[in-house]
From Swiss-Prot:
Enzyme class of the recorded protein, top EC level: lyase
Catalytic activity: ethanolamine = acetaldehyde + NH4(+)
Keyword presence, Lyase: yes
Known pathway: Amine and polyamine degradation; ethanolamine degradation
Gene name for this UniProt entry: eutC
Pfam families linked to this entry: EutC (PF05985)
GO MF, any single term: ethanolamine ammonia-lyase activity
InterPro entries, sorted: EutC, EutC_C
Summary of subunit composition and partner proteins: The basic unit is a heterodimer which dimerizes to form tetramers. The heterotetramers trimerize; 6 large subunits form a core ring with 6 small subunits projecting outwards.
Protein name, per record: Ethanolamine ammonia-lyase small subunit
Entry binding sites for adenosylcob(III)alamin: V210, E231, C261
Function recorded in the entry: Catalyzes the deamination of various vicinal amino-alcohols to oxo compounds. Allows this organism to utilize ethanolamine as the sole source of nitrogen and carbon in the presence of external vitamin B12.
Native organism: Salmonella schwarzengrund (strain CVM19633)
Cofactor(s) recorded in Swiss-Prot or TrEMBL: adenosylcob(III)alamin
Alphabetically ordered keywords of this record: Bacterial microcompartment, Cobalamin, Cobalt, Lyase
């Protein structure tokens, strides 16, 4: 699926929902247009906030032959370019920013989604067999299975046999869920209902792994299960969300090739509202073809 097809899908779905089409996240040619790439600076400062846009725009190359080329390159990407060297080693500010981004990534893996936040969204909360974050990181197999209490809660509080079941899980990034939730779940649910699909009760799974959607689909009898889960964070990017969609999942028979994945959902990648429109179209095609993953007709 190319960018033009994605834009057509977004335009069609958002129009049917009566909403404005979101602006694309493509780079602009105007100076300073990308929010993550502020105006480049060359001064090295001990007082600089290492997580700020100014720090990300810092240029560490001393006495460049073509400063304008470095400035344009620095504006064009959020990657670690133009950081300069001190002999064979990175400059102090570049190293400190690397360490700060690494620390931020570790923090988002270890953080918990607050129970108050889940309640504020009006979501039913269930758990996998995991009891704490340490066990979640060391026993991924237990994160693929619901706890007995969770199974009972789904059977008693969720709509059975839906066309589409939407599930939210913390995964490996708490920030991915809390930062993108309001911009992806409401338009996703609205788009699915606008398409005439029977949508199940959305709920939150704490300590969930991707394969847990197979058991959820089997218990609820869902035709399509859509799991929104936090991605493993990269350096300086802790808000990236993934969507794993699967048709008629079964614990014993569903394999990874049966899943369709849309990744890199965040403001600096695929905008959440745009991703919601693409997921709606994907769910419709899965139901039409009765397939997902590599079994879908492209």
């Amino acid at each position: 699926m190319d960018q033009k097809q994605i834009e057509e899908i977004v335009r069609s779905v958002m129009a049917s929902m009566g909403q404005d089409v979101p602006q694309p996240a493509a780079p602009s040619t105007q100076e300073g247009a990308k929010p993550q790439c502020a105006v480049p600076t060359v001064a090295e400062s001990c007082a600089l906030d290492l997580g700020s846009a100014e720090a990300k725009a810092w240029i560490g190359v001393e006495n460049p032959h073509r400063a304008d080329v470095l400035t344009e390159l620095r504006r064009s990407t959020a990657a670690r370019v133009c950081t300069g060297r001190a002999g064979p080693r990175p400059r102090t500010q570049a190293l400190l920013r690397f360490l700060a981004d690494h620390s931020r990534s570790k923090d988002t893996v270890l953080k918990e989604v607050p129970e108050e936040w889940v309640k504020a969204q009006g979501l039913l909360e269930v758990r996998s067999e995991i009891s704490d974050k340490n066990l979640y990181l060391t026993r991924p197999d237990m994160g693929r299975r619901l706890s007995p209490e969770a199974i009972d809660a789904l059977k008693s509080q969720c709509v059975m046999n839906p066309d589409v079941q939407v599930v939210v899980s913390d995964g490996l990034s708490t920030d991915a869920i809390t930062a993108n939730y309001e911009e992806i779940l409401p338009p996703l649910l609205a788009g699915l209902k606008q398409a005439g699909l029977n949508v199940g009760t959305p709920f939150f799974v704490r300590y969930g792994r991707v394969k847990i959607e197979d058991q959820i689909g089997e218990i609820l009898g869902a035709k399509v299960v859509i799991l929104l889960v936090g991605e493993r964070p990269g350096l300086g990017q802790s808000e990236s969300l993934s969507c794993y969609a699967v048709y008629s999942p079964r614990v014993a028979t569903t394999v990874e090739a049966d899943r369709t994945c849309i990744s890199n959902i965040h403001q600096g990648g695929t905008p959440p509202v745009e991703a919601a429109a693409v997921i709606v179209d994907l769910a419709k095609r899965m139901l039409e073809q009765k397939a997902s993953g590599i079994n879908m007709t492209r």
